[in-house]
Amino acid sequence: MARYLGPKLKLSRREGTDLFLKSGVRAIDTKCKIEQPPGQHGARKPRLSDYGVQLREKQKVRRMYGVLERQFRNYYKEAARLKGNTGANLLQLLEGRLDNVVYRMGFGATRSESRQLVSHKAIMVNGRVVNIASYQVSPNDVVSIREKAKKQSRVKASLELAEQREKPTWLEVDAAKMEGVFKRMPERTDLSADINEHLIVELYSK
């Protein structure tokens, strides 16, 4: 499945919630009628079956993290293989992606922009350039901006935006040095309560 390149607001309206795909700190429901699906006049939402609800939740989370269908299924398989709660494991694997960590640290305004920084070799992990967005960051890893990329206006603008967001407790960021430490894996309570990962587990368990 190809990566979606269309309007970001349309995806959030499709899922009925802000997927944080835009760079602004203002919630997008102040800009558009997020409760209405995309399309002329916003088509009325059909009543979903249990399967439909599970599928929508999976699509919502997959789009939020910018992961393709095959990748997402592989993350689920890995989460099911690990000890502990499968749903929580899945979210930790997604949160541990390098592009997501770059976003959480405030170096990129969105996960999409953070993915670009990674692919353009602007990001280092423990002093070495890593250009794979899906690279799994481990506790105590140091993630930083390459020296020649520190002058990029988009990085500086992203750090300014990040000052207005709630700072993740599992990260430690030095904005002046443009580097941060992935202190630990986030607990479930650290992450959005708007995600119902048990629905995804139910979907894939069938």
UniProtKB/Swiss-Prot annotation:
Assigned keywords, A-Z: Ribonucleoprotein, Ribosomal protein, RNA-binding, rRNA-binding
GO BP: ribosomal small subunit biogenesis; translation
PROSITE patterns in the cross-refs: RIBOSOMAL_S4, S4
SMART domains reported for this sequence: Ribosomal_S4, S4
Source taxon at top rank: Bacteria
Residue stretches making up the S4 RNA-binding domain: 96-156
SS bond partners: none
GO molecular function, one term: rRNA binding
Gene Ontology cellular-component terms listed: small ribosomal subunit
Subunit structure, interactors included: Part of the 30S ribosomal subunit. Contacts protein S5. The interaction surface between S4 and S5 is involved in control of translational fidelity.
Family listed: Belongs to the universal ribosomal protein uS4 family.
HAMAP family for this protein: Ribosomal_uS4_B
Protein name: Small ribosomal subunit protein uS4
